[in-house]
Regions:
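Conserved alpha-helical substructure of the radical SAM core
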Residues: 2-126
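Flexible, active-site-proximal loop/turn residues at the rims of small-molecule/cofactor binding pockets
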Residues: 49, 81, 110, 133, ...
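Residue-level signal for mature regions of secreted extracellular proteins and peptides
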Residues: 29, 33-36, 248, 265, ...
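Radical SAM enzyme [4Fe-4S]-AdoMet core and its adjacent flexible, acidic
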Residues: 128-132, 137-260, 265-270, 274-293
Length: 353
């Protein structure tokens, strides 16, 4: 499967996604549970130990036929913590049996080593692991107060994934509990265990992140972090800097709106999950404005729905090109969280700001 890159190191990255697939093929994210066994300070979805789950029978009956119909070749299983879904193994196998690639985003606390060994026989499966520091005092605290046993288990499980060549990326949110040198160590660790990249996301104003912005790195620390980790990048290892300060005044990277759809546990399909998360905050937007339909209630044609969505919804092309010649729309979700118009500039990373 050829990757369609969203992240471009020559641009100021606006989008939280690193890559998708080339059309007419599609990639989606499937929220198979709202439950999570942790309580992270920055969780977009505000997940906890209660919530709904997507059943194996619903996926088989409603979701899978529409994935095939819409040429979906890659599914990211997410949550909550997707491994909290008791049918995670069967769901994964169902997708693999229909030649749909699977990526699992996990906190790595619930990994079953025997299952990982079995999955290593497949070529189209990998894991992305969240890791926000190298110490109990950083990662453990940021992730809701982990026990020493759980903290050690996370690293053991990362090593297991690396051993079986199933570790694709490490996802990290720079935060005040961890030092810059700690993130240098994290990148070196990821490279040593066989990850292809470390993706650094800022602590964004969605979900619990609204209330924990004081934990975010300052712009100066973000710049220093980037400077100290750039040397770790190599031909087979990438550090992905999402929405870092644009001190180089680079043009804003593209927005792949509609190229990675998100299916919530209740079957709702979002044109972008972050727009829905942002609209759940204290602003003038309605989360329903960014829902295209429901896969449990209708037989959706994604191409048709996307065309209708762009035509009938609140998007327009009023961006002031005469003053923003080196800019693009940037991230809609960030603008929603800031209470801006969708046609406004993404001022956080605009090269002219």
């Amino acid at each position: 499967m050829m990757i369609n890159r969203i992240y471009d190191s020559t641009c100021a990255s606006a989008c939280f996604f690193r890559s998708t697939v080339h059309p007419p093929k599609r990639k989606i994210m499937l929220q198979i549970t709202q439950k999570c066994n942790l309580h992270c300070a920055h969780c977009f979805a505000e997940s906890g130990n209660i919530g709904n789950e997507m059943s194996l029978s619903d996926i088989r009956q409603f979701i899978l036929p529409q994935l095939i119909k819409n040429q979906v070749v890659k599914v990211t299983l997410t949550g909550g913590e997707p491994l909290c879904n008791p049918s995670i193994k069967q769901i994964t196998q169902l997708l693999l049996d229909h030649e749909i690639g699977v990526s699992i985003c996990t906190n790595a606390t619930l990994i079953d080593p025997l299952w990982i060994e079995q999955l290593s026989q497949h070529k189209n499966i990998h894991f992305n692991v969240s890791l926000d520091g190298m110490r109990m005092e950083s990662h453990g605290r940021f992730r809701g107060g982990l026990s020493e046993e759980t903290f050690k288990k996370i690293f053991q499980n990362i090593l297991i994934l690396g051993k079986h060549k199933l570790l694709n990326g490490i996802l990290t949110t720079p935060n005040q509990y961890a030092t810059i040198d700690e993130y240098v160590d994290l990148c070196n660790f990821a490279k040593e265990v066989g990850a292809n990249y470390v993706l650094m996301n800022p602590l964004s104003p969605f979900g619990r992140g609204v209330e924990t912005q004081t934990l975010a790195y300052s712009n100066a620390k973000m710049c220093a972090l980037k400077e100290k980790t750039k040397s770790i990048i190599s031909s087979d290892f990438e550090v992905v800097y999402i929405r870092f300060p644009n001190i180089e005044h680079n043009p804003i990277g593209r927005c792949p709106l509609g190229s990675i759809l998100y299916v919530f546990c209740n079957g709702d399909v979002a044109i972008c999950p972050y727009m829905v998360f942002a609209a759940n905050g204290n602003n003038s937007y309605n989360p329903r404005d960014f829902i295209m339909g429901n896969m449990f209630k209708e037989n959706m044609d994604f191409t048709t729905e996307l065309k209708k969505f762009h035509k009938n919804k609140i998007f327009n092309s009023n961006i002031k090109q005469e003053t923003c010649l080196h800019c693009s729309r940037g991230c809609y979700a960030i603008k929603i969280s800031r209470g801006q118009e969708l046609s406004d500039c993404d001022f956080d990373i605009c090269p002219l700001s």
